[in-house]
Regions:
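A short helix->loop->beta-strand "cap" motif at the edges of active sites that frequently abuts
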Residues: 102, 175, 260-264
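A cross-domain feature marking catalytic cores of carbohydrate-active enzymes
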Residues: 34-38, 77-81, 106-111, 147-149, ...
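N-terminal pre-domain/capping segments
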Residues: 2-134, 138-139, 171, 201, ...
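Acidic/histidine-rich catalytic cores of soluble enzymes
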Residues: 46, 74-75, 160, 164-256
């Protein structure tokens, strides 16, 4: 009962008191999605070296699979899972998304580039690479594109200059530009917000990731970047043999976002540096169940 009162008092997006159970269920479903990173072992491009490819996936098969198996229509594609950036492939992929009654929320661009490089040739090459991916995201009719502002130790000034150019290009394509706490110079949340503010706060948004900050500082760091979030990467990391998430309190992360007034979509994701033998469909079920319960 306390949660229902809280939502009513704060004008929370769910408005639990005012919605029927059916409408509330639809509302929470519209705010839950999933990326392709969790099933990286089933993609030829990202499976562990030397491992057998079992039950393979491609981006072309993801939209229907996610709708049928997980009842998920909000999608996020990882750049490493694209087979091509050719127009014919992208058009076919866009049609698969549409045919499944799905929608592409974000493209995570992790190609080889460094927008904070002090080497001007490298910075210009990186800008050209990023523009190619923005073109692809626009052709796919993605709702947004995530670009990394620069590697750890890079130049903040070069990153700002680059992100200004990237943002101008995104504006031409009518694409929101997202920056995630993703192991570059933006891992300092104050630097992250400085880059956003200097490069284009009207179109540049944060993409808070539950699992990327050190656990000791994650709550404070997430709280700083959450007010500027467009979507949230609802990441789980390590699980024990009983299928319990052991890295941090996943539900607390969602509740932190809700208390901060976040009204957007949570994109479920799992990533760990440990070699774990997991049933990733069950992990996906666990994350989606937690999100649907918490919203």
């Amino acid at each position: 009962m306390q949660r229902r009162i809280f939502l009513m008092r704060t004008g929370g997006w769910m408005l639990s008191v005012g919605l029927s159970p059916v409408r509330a269920a639809h509302a929470s479903a519209d705010r839950v999605g999933m990326g392709t990173v969790i099933f990286r072992n089933r993609f030829e491009q990202t499976r562990p070296k030397g491992s057998e490819l079992v039950d393979p996936l491609t981006l072309l098969s993801v939209p229907a699979y996610y709708r049928e198996r997980f009842d998920v229509r909000n999608l996020e594609f990882w750049s490493h899972h694209f087979e091509s950036l050719e127009t014919a492939y992208l058009v076919e992929l866009r049609e698969r998304v549409q045919a499944a009654g799905a929608r592409l929320i974000n493209v995570q661009v992790d190609a080889a580039y460094d927008l904070a490089s002090n080497d001007e040739d490298e910075r210009q090459r990186s800008l050209a690479t990023v523009r190619q991916w923005i073109d692809a995201a626009a052709l796919l009719r993605s709702r947004a594109v995530r670009i990394n502002p620069g590697r750890a130790g890079g130049s903040i000034e070069k990153s700002i200059a680059s992100m200004k150019e990237v943002n101008r290009y995104c504006l031409l394509k009518r694409l929101p530009l997202l920056t995630e706490n993703h192991f570059g110079l933006e891992m300092d949340p104050d630097v992250h917000l400085r880059i956003r503010a200097a490069a284009g706060p009207k179109n540049i948004h944060t993409l808070p990731d539950f699992g990327n900050y050190p656990v000791g500082t994650m709550w404070e760091s997430l709280a700083k970047i959450l007010p500027y979030a467009y979507v949230v990467s609802a990441k789980a990391v390590d699980f024990n043999e009983q299928g319990e998430h052991i890295s941090y309190d996943f539900d607390r992360c969602v509740q932190l976002c809700e208390r901060a007034g976040f009204k957007g979509i949570y994109l479920a994701e799992q990533w760990s540096r440990r070699d774990q033998t997991l049933d990733y469909e069950k992990i996906a079920d666990w994350m989606l169940q937690r999100l649907r319960k918490d919203l």
